[in-house]
């Protein structure tokens, strides 16, 4: 099975640089059930559209709405950075990352935990810009930024080590490190996600991705089912479940195809690149025949 690295990377970045139980309820912090932060309602709508509903097209439009009234929210520009990354506009990603940094700096003294979390996110975005525009040979130049990511995460942990927003971002970072360093222990890497991260639809999605990439489909299937329970209308999760079932093979292949076809019923809301990928994967599993939409 072909691994969709590009789109998975895009969705991971989106999650790194970033809930509620229903779209109409935007009064609550999308990460915390206690001690909620004052995250703008328009930004929260975009977050839920992107990650819970899997409606990338609507989320991009909602970000344009949010920026008019909530331009001081670092999460907003982290989400915008992820959309630029998805369409390979790395300069746009960098500019959005600079706004993440400026807004994070402005939070110092008001909400130091979120300030450090989004300073880490801005460093990660800048490091990504360097590697994407200058190639792997530039990785050494990005290393100080990577170290700064860890330093800022540690500063946030010193304030509240069990904060859900912090642990969601830290968990995805740990997971990515485990995926590129074979000697890393996956279960240790997933501990932040499993214990303290929220919301569930992003927490379990990350865990499912990690187990899928580690070729542990049974564990991946359990995790993606939990993500789907938290976000039953998200076609990206449906597609991920199809991938895991395809990996299991055998009698699961027809069910995997049905998951791909189910995801394609929401083609109009998907990231265009992801839509192309799902079509390709569904065609591959169907022996070269295009799937219905």
Language model: regions and residue ranges:
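Short coil/turn linkers that connect adjacent helices within long alpha-helical scaffolds
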Residues: 33, 67, 157, 228, ...
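Alpha-solenoid helical repeat scaffolds
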Residues: 44-45, 75-79, 113-118, 165-169, ...
């Amino acid at each position: 099975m072909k691994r969709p690295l590009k789109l998975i990377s895009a969705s991971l970045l989106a999650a790194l640089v970033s809930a509620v139980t229903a779209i109409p309820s935007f009064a609550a912090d999308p990460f915390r059930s206690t001690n909620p932060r004052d995250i703008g309602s328009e930004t929260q709508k975009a977050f839920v559209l992107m990650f819970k509903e899997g409606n990338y097209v609507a989320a991009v439009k909602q970000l344009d709405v949010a920026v008019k009234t909530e331009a001081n929210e670092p999460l907003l520009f982290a989400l915008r950075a992820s959309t630029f990354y998805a369409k390979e506009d790395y300069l746009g990603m960098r500019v959005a990352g600079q706004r993440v940094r400026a807004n994070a700096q402005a939070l110092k003294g008001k909400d130091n935990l979120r300030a450090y979390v989004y300073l880490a996110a801005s460093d990660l975005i800048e490091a990504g810009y360097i590697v994407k525009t200058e190639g792997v040979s530039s990785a050494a130049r990005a290393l100080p930024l990577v170290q700064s990511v860890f330093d800022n995460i540690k500063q946030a942990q010193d304030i509240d080590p069990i904060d859900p927003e912090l642990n969601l971002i830290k968990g995805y970072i740990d997971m990515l490190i485990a995926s590129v360093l074979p000697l890393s222990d996956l279960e240790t890497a997933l501990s932040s996600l499993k214990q303290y991260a929220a919301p569930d639809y992003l927490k379990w999605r990350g865990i499912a991705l990690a187990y899928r990439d580690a070729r542990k489909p049974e564990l991946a299937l359990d995790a993606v089912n939990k993500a789907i329970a938290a976000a039953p209308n998200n076609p990206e999760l449906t597609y991920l479940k199809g991938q895991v079932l395809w990996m299991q093979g055998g009698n699961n292949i027809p069910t995997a195809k049905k998951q791909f076809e189910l995801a394609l019923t929401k083609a109009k809301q998907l990231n265009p690149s992801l839509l192309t990928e799902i079509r390709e994967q569904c065609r591959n599993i169907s022996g070269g025949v295009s799937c219905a939409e």
